[in-house]
Amino acid sequence: LKVKVKNEIVAMGVDGLQPGRRTGIEAEPELWHDVIRDPNTVVIDTRNAYEIAIGSFPGAVDPKTATFRDFPTYVKEHLEPLKGKKKIAMFCTGGIRCEKASSYLIDQGFEEVYQLSGGILGYFEKTAKQGLANKWVGDCFVFDDRVAVTKDLKPSGHEMCSVCRHPLTAKDLADPRTVMGTSCLHCYGPRSD
């Protein structure tokens, strides 16, 4: 067994960021529904593109980030002009990226920043327990053998390409370019030696 010590669980690449000090407003499902329904709110999915492709909240902005390290650039290029004009609401799988992202936005001078309490998985659990409407569309990528889960937290049937690590839908699995252990439609093609 080999243990590797890392400075950050989810790397954003921003020195001095302290999400334990201050973060956005934790929004439980009822507040979350009110916030994302507000036309003065920009809803941002802080996950990576391959996760967003599986499911998201309707109307959420896909920042088109390949990794979480791309998020500060997205903020600078797209959110800075909205500072002081719009509320920002963010969500991620379990809440870790939102903690960091909301802390970063507050450090950058954004005032009204919300984050989905417990992330998407917490939202699924809480809406089911409380009998609330679940506004999510699609499935949710998870970082374990299930690959993705449905709103009731059951495995969705997605598979993971063992070559490029891209999640695959049933349609992707039926594609002739997908040969498990060799390639999928996302990584199929000529390779360099």
Residue ranges and their predicted role:
Residues F91:
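Phosphate-binding active sites in nucleotide-utilizing proteins
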Residues I44-D45:
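Structural scaffold elements adjacent to functional motifs in cytosolic proteins
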